[in-house]
Amino acid sequence: MPTKVVKHFLNQGLLRTKIDEWLAQNFYEAGYSRVKVVQTSLGTNITIWAERPALIIGRRGATIRRLQEVFQTVFGLPNPRIRVEQPENPMLDARVQAFRIARSIERGIHFRRVAFAAINRIMSNGALGVEITISGKLTSERARFEKFKAGKVYKSGHKVDELVDRASAYARLPKGVIGVDVIIVKPGKPGDHVRIKSEEEVKDVVDAIRSEIESLGLQEETASTLREHMEAARPGEEHEEDREES
């Protein structure tokens, strides 16, 4: 049976999941990304990241005040203090891009055009790879999916936790629901990274090695010359010492 401590953390995780789903559903147009909830002795600090923070703040903070009431009454968070920020790079945020693709499809833009535009936008911001999967009744009554990919996309391994961001969204159309799945490999240096040097870089390395070898050769030649001079000078020194003794 789980202890009280385990139950406490399970309930906290469940509460954060409910808050995240509620915000994603209600601030879909704002490009909602994620939320962070920190409970302190003075109240609850809530940080919300979204592509368009103004839609969450509202006119003169009206939406923020309504959010505070929801957090207090629905989720039972005492004294909530809300802060809204924009992600560091919305173009590399999988959830923001998934919501943007879904909104574009809902506006009637062809899904292939939306997917290719999103790939160009994401890759131009430094992503190592991106994969977009769009599924549903795309061109006929029969459901299917199409996958669009660029760069290198990791599906397993420890690099998934370090570099990969993944999110899903849904576009609601009269003919049915279209699913959007986005995987973004953020900028970084993976373990299997191999960089091939250019001809100029290879030439510079070869020249540096050659000069180092030549300098070592000169040092050895100088040392051998000194040894020869020292050996040649020794018999004369011994002869002078013999004459002094005689």
UniProtKB/Swiss-Prot annotation:
Claim: Protease is one of the keywords in the record: no
Covalent S-S links between cysteines: none
Signal peptide location: none
Region (Disordered): 218-246
Lineage, highest ranks first: Archaea, Thermoproteota, Thermoprotei, Desulfurococcales, Desulfurococcaceae
Domain of life, per lineage: Archaea
GO MF, any single term: rRNA binding
Domain KH type-2: 19-98
SMART domains attached to this UniProt entry: KH
Recorded family membership: Belongs to the universal ribosomal protein uS3 family.
GO annotations of cellular component type: cytosolic small ribosomal subunit
Subunit structure: Part of the 30S ribosomal subunit.
Name of the protein described by the UniProt record: Small ribosomal subunit protein uS3
Key word Cytoplasm present: no
Keywords: Ribonucleoprotein, Ribosomal protein, RNA-binding, rRNA-binding
Biased composition (Basic and acidic residues): 226-237
Gene Ontology biological process terms in this record: translation
HAMAP family: Ribosomal_uS3_A
Species this protein is from: Aeropyrum pernix (strain ATCC 700893 / DSM 11879 / JCM 9820 / NBRC 100138 / K1)
